[in-house]
Amino acid sequence: MILDIEMLRSFYASYSDSVKQAKATVKRPLTYAEKVLFAHLYDPTQLRPYKRGIEYVDFRPNRVAMQDATAQMALLQFMNAGKDKVAVPASVHCDHLIRADVGATADLPEACKTNKEVYDFLKSVSQKYHIGFWGPGAGIIHQVVLENYAFPGGMMVGTDSHTPNAGGLGMVAVGVGGADAVDVLTGQPWELKMPRLIGVHLKGKLSGWATPKDVILEILGILTVKGGTNAILEYFGEGLDSISTTGKATICNMGAELGATCSIFPFDENADEYLRKTGREEIAVLAQQNASELRADDEVMANPSAFYDQIVEIDLSKVEPHLNGPFTPDAATPISHMKAKGPANDYPMVVEVGLVGSCTNSSYQDLARAASVARQAYEKGIEVKGQLIINPGSEQIRFTAERDGILDDFKKIGALIMTNACGPCIGQWKRHTDDNTRKNAIVTSFNRNFRRRADGNPNTYAFIGSPELTVALTIAGRLDFNPATDTLLDKEGNSVKLDAPTGYTFPPKGFAVEDKGFIAPSADNANVEVVISPDSNRLQKLAPFAAWDGKDLTDMPLLIKTEGKCTTDHISMAGPWLKFRGHLQNISDNLLMGAVNAFSGESNKVKNQLDGKYVEVSTAAKAYKAQGISSIVVAEDNYGEGSSREHAAMEPRFLNVKVILAKSFARIHETNLKKQGMLALTFCNKDDYNKVQEDDRISLTGLKEFAPGSKLTVTLKHQDGSEDSFLVEHTYNDTQIAWFKAGSALNFAAKK
């Protein structure tokens, strides 16, 4: 059964005409990303040649996807909107709350028991408001979306930063916060700054141990975690033909680590085959009928530099297997360099655990190729040195992989098969170790490797690679093992070499599954009741934030001046805190607990200016709030890098933090702050960051003249009586300023 088929038929019936009208209006050929964007304008009569990276544009996405950790807050907000049902097709996926411990057989029932209140809430909200519900164990959101919902030429938003995964099948798929999702769910325009376009030209063909994962790991080394901010990466070139749809999805998935709005590949025969193999032949036919507009125009391909803002050249034949890390996904290292780089940087060289899975690399092809490496270790008599953990991407993949013997290949070398869920990738991992503070190395096929992310240990050095390389390094137990050149010893002491991985793109017998774990939207929702206990410590109804009082912000205490990388993991930690994602008051206790205090070098320890004592960040914020005092956070570059979790914006707002002043922001987080009525401001001169002192009282003036393009003034009153003043800037437009004045975007929408 093809889900939401009527919407898809309607979309394709008008798509090509919409693109042709766009070309006639802007009077030039279009890139593929532009075609999709222009075909989804909220008001097509407003179509014009928008200024990339400058103008905000209103769009009308086709659908919304939500995962269980972020869906709670999104749907709590939606419930306040007064709607009977969602305006566009939507789905909820229960994948983030399942803890990996001893294996799927025990872990899944335990998760269903532990999270029953949240699952029941999400299920009932989904039934009441006509939302598709994928229960615990059904799979990871982005793999399930790729298998069931993604379609060429479409536009989707999702409350998860790796939503761009669907770009592998030709979608503009963008990670957003819950408030953005609510805009789409209620039929309002969804606002996005018109993205810049980065063209990535792929030529040649991957070979040996090189994989699509290594392509994006190499690009991360080139562009860094900020290089894609407010941009779409559009891939083109002859190299595309040799990369499968799931391989392309992997590349698009980790575009999130570049800070990109999304990434996209054009429709091709690989996409056509993927649609047919996943039971969506009618969509394949519809896409073929629109094929000429599901790729960039020929004139663009003839002269790419005239149409893209930047070009990145990648020769696939020269791509090496990579290990990126530790602690940041853009620290790119070809595996051939690790023998020198590892010791030089004092990396722990023993690989203790290898983890295969995540939304980035959990497809059938990923598991099949990784299993071919595991099978060699078993057949060649190689003793496996590390622990191997596997998370399949969906129940359909798990069932098919088990039928085809793939999971047995892993089990034969001692691998542990976890639930079809995020697990360790999002910090949901009960790691069995002798010392959870010890310096050690793990290798994963995941997407992020921030300090403490996987297991909570700040001394775990996490490196990102392909599933194939992850298995090879786990077998060898060494970070510097190069499977292309190095040998291992079998049980008789003979030197043996691992052959390059192989594996089917699709299961030869086709995909199979007994129960996908899906509950379809129901039209019979009149008697569905959504109950939230007032005594719950996991779910809490939301109260509107207060509107701006019309005054400047004066004499604010500094809550924290953060030093270095401050991701959404640092601002609102996941792992054990995921259970409070539906309870704003409780989860606010983790505010900025991972951020490093620039004055002490310590985490979660700041000076409470009311009594001079050093306390947890949330404790200081609550003390200020109790006295009716607003506070401010000062930060460095790319503040809010990482996930789309809007809790990282809602928590400071809840605790009366009014301003985040940073050197620069990550795209999603900046939008989330604006949506919650906060002020996300940047230094005009980044050196002014150094003027901020621990005991400062900080004032922000000029808010009565707050307007697009205007500058505001920050004044620092130092403890010694001296002062510093400097200008700060912002990216707010008129609508976003209205959100601030109303107290939040939801407040503003409610007033309209």
Model segments located where?
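Mobile "lid/hinge" segments at catalytic clefts and subdomain interfaces of large enzymes
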Residues: 3-4, 68, 149-284, 382, ...
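Long, structured ligand/cofactor-binding scaffold of large enzymes
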Residues: 8-11, 15-195, 581-633, 638-640
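Terminal amphipathic helices with adjacent charged low-complexity linkers/tails
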Residues: 42, 46, 51-60, 74, ...
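Short glycine/threonine-rich loop-to-helix capping motif typified by GTGT followed
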Residues: 47, 147, 151, 243-249, ...
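Non-catalytic terminal/interface segments that mediate subunit docking, oligomerization
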Residues: 76-80, 306-401, 405, 523-659
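Extended C-terminal subregions enriched in glycine
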Residues: 379-429, 435, 643, 649, ...
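Acidic, glycine-rich flexible loop/linker segments
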Residues: 488-505, 670-739, 746-749
